[in-house]
Amino acid sequence: MPRSRINGNFIDKTFSIVANILLRIIPTTSGEKEAFTYYRDGMSAQSEGNYAEALQNYYEATRPEIDPYDRSYILYNIGLIHTSNGEHTKALEYYFRALERNPFLPQAFNNMAVICHYRGEQAILQGDSEIAEAWSDQAAEYWKQAIALTPGNYIEAHNWLKITRRFE
């Protein structure tokens, strides 16, 4: 049974109803409909914390989805799940892939910066200041890109860049 029929959350139900109506009235190919159905089910599973199910749906959504913009959001969401699961290398890979298709995803740059910052903090705890500095520099570059795309957002990152003298 499609996830949209079993979800009990009011907002998810409303989203599913609206999405189903739009799929019926907007001219789309069968591949686009299939991709969207998997994407919608992935979002629903992800919102409930069912990450394995969400990943399965997102991977299925990538097969028929050919639009680079839509595909970027699928890849971004896969990156989010890998981040939540602590699989940072995989997460970075999917954020990169999302940005290859849509370079205007500030949230992907932000999440990549957060991972790099975390790795820098871990390197400090391990006593490796050189590696920590490299990770922090990389985090700074990603945060600068996120901020450039959405000035006024990512205030904490902006402050961190100023405090660490990495903001130009």
Swiss-Prot record:
UniProt entry keywords in alphabetical sequence: Chloroplast, Membrane, Photosynthesis, Plastid, Repeat, Thylakoid, TPR repeat
SUPFAM superfamilies: TPR-like
Pfam families named among the record's database cross-references: TPR_1
Location of the protein in the cell: Plastid, Chloroplast thylakoid membrane
Entry annotated with the keyword Repeat: yes
Name the UniProt record assigns to this protein: Photosystem I assembly protein Ycf3
Role description: Essential for the assembly of the photosystem I (PSI) complex. May act as a chaperone-like factor to guide the assembly of the PSI subunits.
Stated family: Belongs to the Ycf3 family.
Keyword hit for Kinase: no
BP term (GO), one: photosynthesis
Major place of residence: plastid
Any single Gene Ontology cellular-component annotation: chloroplast thylakoid membrane
Residue ranges that the Swiss-Prot or TrEMBL entry lists as coiled coil: none
Name of the coding gene: ycf3
Residue stretches of each TPR repeat: 35-68, 72-105, 120-153
InterPro entries xref list: PSI_Ycf3_assembly, TPR-like_helical_dom_sf, TPR_rpt, Ycf3/AcsC/BcsC/TPR_MFPF
Listed HAMAP family: Ycf3 (MF_00439)
Membrane protein topology class: Peripheral membrane protein
